[in-house]
Structure formats: C-alpha cells, structure tokens
Regions:
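Cleavable N-terminal export/targeting peptides
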Residues: 1-28
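Strand-connecting loop/turn motifs
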Residues: 27-29, 53-57, 89-93, 126-128, ...
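Residues that define the transmembrane beta-barrel architecture of outer-membrane proteins
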Residues: 28, 41-45, 71-77, 92-94, ...
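N-terminal secretory signal peptides
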Residues: 28-33, 40-55
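Transmembrane beta-strands of outer-membrane beta-barrel proteins
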Residues: 28-32, 60-62, 77, 94-98, ...
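Gram-negative (and chloroplast) outer-membrane scaffold detector with strong preference
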Residues: 46-109, 151
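Outer-membrane beta-barrel "beta-signal"
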Residues: 81, 140-153
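Surface-exposed, polar helix/loop patches in the mature regions of secreted/periplasmic/lumenal proteins
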Residues: 91-93, 97-135
Length: 153
C-alpha cells in the first residue's frame, strides 16, 4: 500500500468519525456497497455512513469506495447529501443527490489526487437493500453502477 493510499484512508476515517459523532446515534446507519465503474473501468467496494435527517428527507451520507482494475487503484472519498422520497404504499424509497469527491489515483507510474463531483440516484428497500447509479463530473469516475445494503433497517 502506497503512502498516498494510507494517507487517504486515514483522512477518510477522520471525516467519517466526525460525521458519526455529530449525529444522534439512534438515527444513524452504516452500509456496504460494491459495483462497477466506467472510465476508469474498475470494480469497487466500500462503505457509507448516513446521518439522522438534516432537514425533512435530507441526509448527509459520506462514503468511501476502493476501486481496483485497469492497472489503477482508486480511493474515492465522497461527501454526498441525499434527498429521500418514499414511494406511496411501497417498501421502496427513491433517493437523489450529490456532492464533492476527493479521488486518490495510484498506478505503477505514480499517484495523483483529484477533486470531483458526483450526481446520484437510487432505490432503497425498507429492509436495507439498495441500487445506485452515480454520474461523475470533473475528475470523478464517469459512471458507477452499485448495489449495497444498509444495516439496522
């Protein structure tokens, strides 16, 4: 593991711990995620933390994703906010949102840190399963398709 990757993981852990301590423990949730990205073409996995509502239906949901493949390792720290819109008489909730990203890229030729922005949408089931699509702007991966699970639902 390179120095850049270690530093980025520590920075992400610090951001997540501040978010966790700032919210009511009973309304917090943790989740895991995995999927595939386009440009760079990678598989990724990671986790997220979701706060209690900041406003009605609005949650802060920072997440950390580690991507591998295409002779590249990516660590993405995504500081996203989502708006949740429950579907009537359904166990599913639509959500949309976005936020800034810090992307750490590591190859055999060196490493780089780039800023980006994500726009996302997804469906989350009352039992915790979710599906998500993320569009990356600036220097974030162009497109991500993910699936995940939120614990404690």
């Amino acid at each position: 593991m390179t120095r850049l990757t270690r530093v980025s993981l520590w920075a992400a852990a610090a951001v997540m711990s501040v978010a966790v301590s700032a919210s009511d423990a009973s309304a917090q949730s943790l989740g895991v995620r995995a999927g595939a990205s386009v440009d760079p073409d990678q598989f990724y996995f990671g986790g997220h933390y979701e706060t209690a509502p900041l406003a009605e239906h609005v949650h802060f949901r920072p997440n950390l994703e580690l991507g591998v493949g295409n002779d590249l390792t990516t660590v993405a720290v995504n500081l996203e906010v989502v708006y949740k819109a429950p579907l009537r008489r359904q166990p599913w909730t639509f959500y949309g949102g976005g936020g800034p990203a810090i992307n750490f890229y590591d190859t055999d030729r060196g490493s780089d840190t780039e800023g980006g922005f994500n726009i996302l949408g997804g469906l989350e089931h009352d039992k915790g399963l979710f599906f998500e699509v993320k569009f990356g702007l600036i220097d974030s991966p162009d497109l991500k398709f993910g699936i995940g699970y939120v614990f404690g639902k």
